[in-house]
A protein has these predicted regions:
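Generic low-complexity, intrinsically disordered segments
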Residues: 2-10, 14-17, 21, 95
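Conserved beta-strand-loop-beta-strand hairpin that lines the nucleotide-binding pocket
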Residues: 13-44, 52-77, 121-218
Length: 218
């Protein structure tokens, strides 16, 4: 293994020593994600119920094939397969990052993450596990930020006649009949719902990347 490779892996997992990176890469028996999980938990563990919850959440993410790109207190970056099976374990992780927030704020964040991730997996990744969705979760002192980028081509919001966000005022459920005609599953309230749940919601130009912010006071 070259020095450059070790340096690159060490930058990706800043909490791991180079010795751990080299051992993991050489043995190829334990993934760096698993070692990073263990190292992160060992440094923050106080033996509390919250630590046990985080351990379970991270283990569930690993089993679901979720790749950890960065794992720091208050900052988590993930690569997520476009598979509905990832939604539940990722929400468990989100719940750990919401520790100390009011039930109302926690519920709003969890629902928003779920809706945006579902859209990314369905419309961006087309339920193809090989298509990866990038997820960033950031917990600040008075805000929670979620950024999700899917591998799709994006969309034109003006053409989403199957989404509730474009229903005319005189027909607030028009999208339901459109979805039925197109053979789409029921729903279509995702973007509209998230706009009501969070304080800021913004897309990039292609509309294949979305960021929302939820503010709160401790």
């Amino acid at each position: 293994m070259s020095f450059a490779v070790v340096e690159g892996l060490a930058r990706r997992f800043p909490r791991l020593s180079k010795e751990k990176v080299m051992i993991a890469a050489a043995e190829q028996s334990t993934s760096l994600n698993e070692i990073a999980f263990g190292d992160f938990l060992a440094q923050r563990s106080t033996g509390t119920e919250a630590d046990a919850g985080l351990t379970d959440a991270l283990s569930a993410c690993s089993l679901a094939g979720i790749e950890v790109v960065s794992l720091l207190p208050g900052w988590v970056e993930l690569r997520v397969p476009s598979d509905l099976a990832v939604i539940s374990p990722l929400q468990e992780l989100v719940a750990q990052l919401e520790a100390g927030l009011s039930p109302e704020v926690s519920e709003a964040i969890s629902r928003a993450v779920r809706e945006m991730l579902y859209n990314a997996v369905e419309y961006g990744g087309h339920f193809d596990p090989a298509a990866l969705v990038e997820v960033k979760l950031i917990r600040l002192e008075h805000a929670f930020i979620c950024r999700i980028k899917d591998p799709g081509d994006g969309f034109d919001p003006c053409t989403l006649d199957h989404a509730a966000i474009n229903n005319p005022n005189d027909n607030p459920v028009r999208h339901a009949s459109v979805r039925e005609e197109k053979g789409l599953r029921g729903g279509g309230f995702g973007i509209l719902l998230v706009r009501q749940l969070v304080d800021e919601l913004v897309y990039n130009e292609r509309h294949n990347e979305v960021q929302f912010v939820k503010y709160f006071s401790n």
